[in-house]
Each structure stands twice: as structure tokens, then as C-alpha cells.
């Protein structure tokens, strides 16, 4: 896609596209994948890329993307927010402008919106070549062949999972960090959520298969894995083993070469002491936790069908921090859920003050078609926006105060990249410390410059609003060291 047709997110997504020795050869076609939404979609896009490469397609270079020198554009969509359809059709429209320049370009649409609006997509956007659901990644090459042969849009969306996406080939976006899905789908019935409709009921992978995949990731160069699931800590409940997730975490601790393990997302109702103990006692399990609150009002939590209340939520946080005082805990909060009063909102603000999250993903409630909450009486937008702004201001204050506590401390950072156009002059690198905080590091003059995947221990010299800076003065006794 041309630069002037791309959003900032699209430009950033270029960096996630895999490249290999096939570049310069068109193979069956040069492709680019644009991903919207959550980490599971990022994981699925790696599988889409893997399936395409296994069938003779070649990932595009940055120059090919910028020059529209493409044979296939794939859009992996999200359905979580109300504007998901607008974003999808807007992106499909931009893809069509590329097709006007390259008439033979094929356009494929997958992901959660494809699962929901399969027929509408084909009817509304006749230039789309293929529509495939979340359970049909492996069908994409066949659909493209059929479209090429017939000239007609091909639609393949099934409700039953035939095989885990993780069993498909993968073209991983990162050499050092890997996504590993432990389950797909969700058994919860939150009244605001569309995920059970688009992803289906929860199905767990076999622990042995998960561990085999992790070992392969490490053999391929990964230093870090993130375990993925809509509700990771209900892993194993289907076979009657409520300790399966904590056992899996401990098993990750036995894998040689695996430096860091994270997971997302757990459900507070199923977060048990055995998981806390496994996190605290397994050295390579990072003390980072995304713990969705959604609301601090018990009345609203009940309306959301969230099977916990604010007191239980805060009690679990207390147990986590007692076991791991350094834990960084982030959250999700929905503002303006139908029926939310100012009193309900103030209860959310109170919980946020007590919880002191490291960060929060705050969302204005978006009604999703077919969910129970969409049929409830909605709150005026101006009221919701005012509450949203107040919550964001409170959380930003807490985040800044939390980051300030890192100043003067030594942190170990896994290097994931370099900063800006001047990185070769400033030797400034970036990465995340153990609890997930983003750290930008200035390499002191005369000290070794780390490569991506190296670990740097450095003294934090300044806390920003959303990240940390480490510009250590080695001569003054501040720390800087590199571990390969």
C-alpha cells in the first residue's frame, strides 16, 4: 500500500511481516497481511502467513508494500468494538484502491468480522476474492485458487474447529518472542462480549503439544513466549484438572533456554492460589499480569455476568502482591455499560485507586450485535465521555507515580529494537524489563552495543509517562552490562 494510504498502525505492521530467502521471487504471489485486534489475531496472522508460505506464496518486502507491488492482501479482522465494521470496510476500501492499480490483486478477509458478516462482506465489497472464518485458516490457499479459476468470491466459514491454528505452519513475526496458544474460544457468557460467538466454546490443547511447541520456539531462537487464551487459567477444566494451568507454568520452568514466560488473559473468577504460587516460584515466569476488572461496581459486574465482585478482585490482587511485591498488574475497564450510574462509576474509580494498576486499557462501552447488553438502555455519549476522561486522568496519574518508583533501580531489559532514525548515532536501544515495562536505554560511550535478543542490565535514570529511560553514567557507578 502507498505511504499516503496507510495509517500509523499499518506502517507499524510492516515491521511484523516475515521475510526470508524467497524475497525477490514472486512464487505463487507476493502477499501482505494487515492485522486488526488482539494478540490472538496476531497469532492467527502468523499462521495465515505460514500457510501461505507453505503453499508457495512469498511475504512482501517493505518496498513492495510501499510500491503496491502485491498479488495478495489479507485483512485479519476484529469484532470486539462497535467500530470494528467501520474499520474493516474502510480498510477493504483502501485495498480496493490498490486493486484499481493492480487488477489481478486478490483480497482476502478473515478473522472475527468475517465469522460474523461473511455474506455481507461478499455482497458489500464485490472486489473481495475470499472470505474465511477464524476456523478456516488452512482453507485460504484453496479459496484463492478457486477465485482465480472462477472469478467469483469464495466464502468458507465453519462453526466447528477442525484443528487448532497452532497445528498449522507459522511464519513468526519475531525471532526472539513467540506467541503460543494454549486454548481457543471461551465458555463465559459476559453480556458485552462477542468472542464466544466468533471463537466458539473453549477447547484446550494437550499440555504435551504446548510444551513441544515452546521447545521448538526456543530451538528456533526464541527467548520469550507468551501463552495465549481467552481465559488461560480455566485451562484443563474441561478434563477435570483445575491445576492444569499452574502445572503448565511450572513445566515451562524446566525448559532450557527459555528466559521469560508471560500469559494473557486470565479471568479473575478462576485465578487461584496455585497459579499465584507457580508464578512466584518459577524463575522464568514473569511477574506481569493482565487482570481485567471491567467495572468496580458489583451491580454492573452482575449485569455483565462477571462471576466475581470487587471485594474478591481486590483480595486476589492482595494475595498476588504478597507473593510478588514487584508484580506489575494491568487491567481492562469498560466505561458506560448500560445502566451505569454516577455512583457505579465512582465505585470503579475507588477500586482503581485501591488497585493501583500499572496501566489500564479503558474502553467506552460498544454494543455488539447479538449480545444481551446491546438490547439494554444505553447511556448518553456525552455522559460516558466525561466519565471516560476522568478515569483516564486518574489512571495516568497512578501510572506515572508507579513508574517513578523505578528511578535509580537496576533493571534487566530484553532488547527488542532500536529507537528512531538516530539510533546508530545515539546507540539507543529499547526493550522490556521483566515485569513488562518499556525501557529505552542509552548505550554509554565505549560500552558494547547490544543486539536484538540480548539482555541489558542498566540503571533507570528517568521515568516518563509511559516508559522508563536508562542513560547510565558508568563512571559515576551506575550499572550497564550486556548478557548475550
Curated annotation (Swiss-Prot):
Catalyzes the methylthiolation of N6-(dimethylallyl)adenosine (i(6)A), leading to the formation of 2-methylthio-N6-(dimethylallyl)adenosine (ms(2)i(6)A) at position 37 in tRNAs that read codons beginning with uridine. Gene3D superfamilies: Methylthiotransferase, N-terminal domain, tm_1862 like domain. This is tRNA-2-methylthio-N(6)-dimethylallyladenosine synthase. SMART domains: Elp3 (SM00729). One of its GO terms (cellular component) is cytosol. It catalyses: N(6)-dimethylallyladenosine(37) in tRNA + (sulfur carrier)-SH + AH2 + 2 S-adenosyl-L-methionine = 2-methylsulfanyl-N(6)-dimethylallyladenosine(37) in tRNA + (sulfur carrier)-H + 5'-deoxyadenosine + L-methionine + A + S-adenosyl-L-homocysteine + 2 H(+). Residues 172-401 form the Radical SAM core domain. It comes from the Bacteria. Binds 2 [4Fe-4S] clusters. One cluster is coordinated with 3 cysteines and an exchangeable S-adenosyl-L-methionine. Belongs to the methylthiotransferase family. MiaB subfamily. PROSITE patterns: MTTASE_N (PS51449), MTTASE_RADICAL (PS01278), RADICAL_SAM (PS51918). Keywords: 4Fe-4S, Cytoplasm, Iron, Iron-sulfur, Metal-binding, S-adenosyl-L-methionine, Transferase, tRNA processing.
